[in-house]
Amino acid sequence: MQVKKLGYILFVGVIATICILPVAVMPWQTEKAVGNEQLASFPELRKEDGSFNTGILNEFSDYFADHFGFRHEMITLNDQLTGTMLKTLDSSSVLLGKDDWLFYKSTLADYTGAELFTARQSYAAAHVLGLMQEYCEENGIGFCFTIAPNKNSLYGSQMPARYTAASVRNAQLLQQQMEQQNVRYVDLFKTLSDHEEQLYYRRDSHWNMRGAQLAAQTLLKELKGSEAEFDSCINGKTSPHTGDLYEMVYPAGNETEQDTAYDFTYRYDEKFHSADDITIHTENSAADGSIFVYRDSFGINLHPFLAQSYGNACFSRNMPYRLTAVTEEQPDVLLVELVERNLNWLLERAPEMPAPERTAVPAADTGTSAKAQRKDGRMEGTFCLTGDLSGQRVDDDSPIYILAETGTYEASPCGEGIQPFTAYLPQNVREQQLKAAFLSDGEWVFCALDD
């Protein structure tokens, strides 16, 4: 009887310890974010205005969920068990593929073709790039756009068999429109897919250094007209790399992948901290020319090769793209690199540049109106006009003009809404009556814009 009672006590003690220990160690544990997550802060009893924080219990619940003891170890153990036993992961962000390859779940829509661009969206995304190209060329700057392929666009053979790859994807639809609208584009899909060497990390969403090297060589052949040689920069060593996807599902793990190491001769400016900096400036006295690159996280591995190839280079993660920042630098060329899974950003985040002036068009009045907003802009001497023509019959391949009393301007066909537009207009037209003109069944028509 005593032995049985002792067994109960030990069992209860073990369970109690398991429950209490994660709470008990919280004051001494510094929790780090997993992947790109934002950890909840400790809640305040009162708000900034001095009133009682009625949401304190919910906020504390979020804080506890993000900071309890041994959180990383528990997440890692859980995903190791589910991955081994069920061949899946208990993760909203990461997908387990074959041979322990990891993929972003956010790329599934691209991979399966579940959210294909409409004809209008394909035209609009390419047209935004065309307007950026026009602005650059008018300011004596070359322009080029490229797409960093999703990992499963190149390594679909490592995806779970339950997902079927689409025959057409948004990148292809956009590429067709860019060709029709004469947007300068470098196709990295063909270059990378034709290469037998593994060019992406198994447990990361990005290309490895060899993949970045091949991408850079393809870009530089177009941008500088000559083959770039980087094999001489390889130092014969390897560097360990911990994948971003691996850290999300196995935050307490310590496995790495070996990556090719290079020795470059370019130099960062004194403001440089890391490859994640919003803006990076480099110099290389042994190279010529200058480049401005709008990039995303794929630029972490890509930028060293471009920095090595140009006398002066600027790399920026700012989004929306600020074209006025480019003209301030006055580079030889602007390169825009965007990962495949974020191509929708071209439809949602309008580039910051003055709306180009256009010749007035004879347009018939539809007798209708559309909602628009006039907001302050960051560019000196301009304001930002945004709106949505979703109630109008706009042709798929129609530009959008803004008719002011003193001029006609073209808006970027992107922003918020189903049929959005954004235009940075001169301040002197802010108080004028504005209209939106567009093609409808091949004919120019206009509607009033109501604030």
Descriptions of predicted regions:
Residues 1-451:
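Extracellular glycan-modifying ectodomains
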